[in-house]
Amino acid sequence: MTTVPPHSVQVHTTTHRYEAGVVPPARFEAPRYEAGIKAPSSIYHSERGPTTSQVLAVVAGLPVGGILLLLAGLTLAGTLTGLVVATPLFIIFSPVLIPATVAIGLAVAGFLTSGVFGLTALSSFSWILNYIRETQPASENLAAAAKHHLAEAAEYVGQKTKEVGQKTKEVGQDIQSKAQDTREAAARDARDAREAAARDARDAKVEARDVKRTTVTATTATA
């Protein structure tokens, strides 16, 4: 009776190849997320509150958009009011073409300005929404960078304020010196005028005395 040798298994560490009809064990694979399902980390980030960059974007964009919308509305209202007021004038003063042309140009400029302000405001709101939707979580030093920029802006404003104050002081000194020069010139002119008047008075007295003397002499000679 012959014995059948057992099946032998050869394992190669480099290729992981199995021979002699032995079925390799099943490998464990990490579960995949498909069909647009995000990983738990992204879910965690989506459940977090608004980041500093989003807050700064909203704070910076909302006032700009609101102001531009307000300017657009005011410009449109002013343009319409101007047209309502100017239309009867166009009908009455139709031969005057230059004012009509200027008014039409101003009206067109008003409409264009209103449209530009409105489009800019809408673009600002759209940018805010896109930025909030697509922005990534802010880094740790974002607050420090914002504080640094605010400090630089405050320093710049303080320096400009100091320069404006210095220029205002210099202009005030110049105005004061010019006023003093003007007062001195006026006083000098008044003094010269008084001296000229006194001199004219003396000359008039001398001339009157000479005339009187001449008259007396002529009367004496006639007598």
From Swiss-Prot:
Please give the residue ranges the record annotates as the region 2 X 11 AA tandem repeats: 183-204
Q: What is this protein called?
A: P24 oleosin isoform B
**What Gene Ontology terms describe where this protein resides (cellular component)?**
membrane; monolayer-surrounded lipid storage body
Query: Which residue ranges does UniProt annotate as crossing the membrane?
Result: 55-75, 89-109, 110-130
**Residue ranges of the region described as 2 X 7 AA tandem repeats:** 158-171
Residues in a coiled coil are none
Stretches the record annotates as Hydrophobic: 58-129
Which InterPro entries does the annotation name?
Answer: Oleosin (IPR000136)
What is the native source organism of this protein?
Glycine max
